[in-house]
């Protein structure tokens, strides 16, 4: 379909790759179109940590991870997914895009920093243990 629509210049399907940092730093947008059960999709967090905005379907924790830094669309909604991709493509290279990239990276530091998460879990465990 990519070839038929003459989009090969713009879209690359990479498959499995061991050098995530290099890949994430080399892409403009990460799109995750899942229709069921992703739990905590690590690749979304990895993308955002590299400053790559994400377009995700509202499955598992994807919408929580992305927050307002990217786009969240309903699962099994190809038209809405296409609209989100189109919006992102028009935004690339603008000041708004730069802010979006920075917000994605900042959200990872604020919400998913391992030391902050450990403190939060410890606090929760302490509260649960205290109630017993």
Predicted regions span which residues?
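Short, structured helix-loop element that forms part of the nucleotide-activated donor/catalytic region
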Residues: 1-8
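Short alpha-helical segment that forms part of, or immediately flanks, the ligand-binding pocket
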Residues: 21, 39-49, 63-64
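A short hydrophobic beta-strand element within the catalytic core of glycosyltransferases
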Residues: 31-32
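Short hydrophobic beta-strand element within catalytic cores of glycosyltransferases
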Residues: 53-56
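Conserved acidic donor-binding segment of nucleotide-sugar-dependent glycosyltransferases
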Residues: 71-79, 88-93
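A charged, aromatic-enriched C-terminal amphipathic alpha-helix characteristic of glycosyltransferases
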Residues: 96-127
């Amino acid at each position: 379909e990519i070839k038929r629509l003459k989009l090969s210049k713009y879209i690359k399907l990479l498959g499995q790759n061991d050098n995530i940092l290099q890949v994430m730093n080399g892409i403009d947008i990460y799109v995750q179109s899942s229709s069921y059960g992703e739990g905590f999709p690590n690749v979304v967090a990895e993308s955002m940590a590299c400053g790559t905005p994400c377009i995700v379907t509202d499955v598992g924790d994807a919408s929580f991870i992305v927050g307002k830094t990217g786009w969240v669309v309903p699962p099994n909604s190809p038209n809405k997914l296409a609209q989100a991709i189109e919006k992102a493509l028009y935004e690339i290279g603008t000041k708004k895009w730069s802010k979006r990239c920075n917000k994605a990276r900042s959200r990872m530091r604020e919400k998913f920093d391992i030391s902050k998460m450990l403190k939060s879990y410890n606090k929760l465990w302490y509260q649960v243990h205290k109630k017993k």
